[in-house]
């Protein structure tokens, strides 16, 4: 990775510094001044970021959650942090949508996505379905890879079982 110019140490440090001093501060300011209308939580795993949980709680505390639309791309490996539960927060907001990343079901999904506990993912997804008021609030985000091609039928069956849509994207390896 260090051979790639955008990953070279000085640039990486500059980006991190910019993110920490500029981007995060602008986000915090937008929360505190109630100017945020939409948040798209993605990249890495947003539910692992303490900032996510603090910001969501703060928006509710400030009393303007009903004016904010919240979207996620998440692997749903976590749905709570320090006693705060995602699916208790989301109904407080104007609207929300979760696209949950999954590459396959069961052992195949666990093989493709390192760290996936499929049964835990399934419990978390069903927990979201229980609070969802519309079909688009909880969707499967299926990345089709070579091993994942073997999972097409299982993923379709899962979407039928859960009564949810599948959004697909193809992963190219070149």
Place the predicted regions along the sequence by residue.
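Short secondary-structure boundary/capping segments
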Residues: 55-56, 113-117, 154-159
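Phosphate/oxyanion-binding loops and surfaces in catalytic or ligand/nucleic-acid-binding neighborhoods
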Residues: 2, 131, 158-165
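Short, acidic, metal-binding catalytic loop of nucleotide-sugar glycosyltransferases
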Residues: 58-64, 131-132
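Distinct, well-ordered alpha-helical segments
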Residues: 51-57, 81-89, 151-153
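Alpha-helical packing segments of well-folded alpha/beta enzyme cores
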Residues: 23, 27, 55, 121-124, ...
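Catalytic cores of alpha/beta
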Residues: 146-162
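Catalytic domains of carbohydrate-active enzymes, especially glycoside hydrolases
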Residues: 30-31
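Core AdoMet radical
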Residues: 2-22, 34-51, 62-82, 90-123, ...
């Amino acid at each position: 990775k260090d051979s790639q110019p955008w990953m070279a140490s000085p640039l990486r440090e500059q980006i991190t510094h910019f993110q920490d001093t500029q981007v995060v501060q602008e986000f915090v300011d937008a929360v505190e001044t109630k100017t945020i209308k939409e948040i798209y939580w993605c990249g890495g795993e947003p539910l692992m970021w303490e900032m996510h949980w603090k910001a969501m709680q703060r928006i509710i505390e400030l009393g303007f959650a009903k004016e904010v639309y919240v979207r996620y791309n998440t692997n749903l490996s976590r749905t709570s942090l320090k006693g705060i539960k995602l699916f208790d927060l989301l109904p407080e907001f104007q609207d929300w949508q979760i696209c949950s990343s999954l590459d396959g079901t069961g052992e195949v999904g666990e093989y493709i996505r390192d760290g996936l506990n499929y049964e835990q993912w399934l419990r978390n997804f069903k927990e979201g379905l229980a609070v969802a008021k519309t079909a688009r609030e909880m969707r499967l985000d299926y990345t089709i890879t070579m091993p994942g091609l073997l999972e097409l039928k299982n993923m379709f069956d899962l979407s039928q079982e859960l009564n949810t849509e599948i959004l697909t994207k193809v992963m190219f390896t070149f």
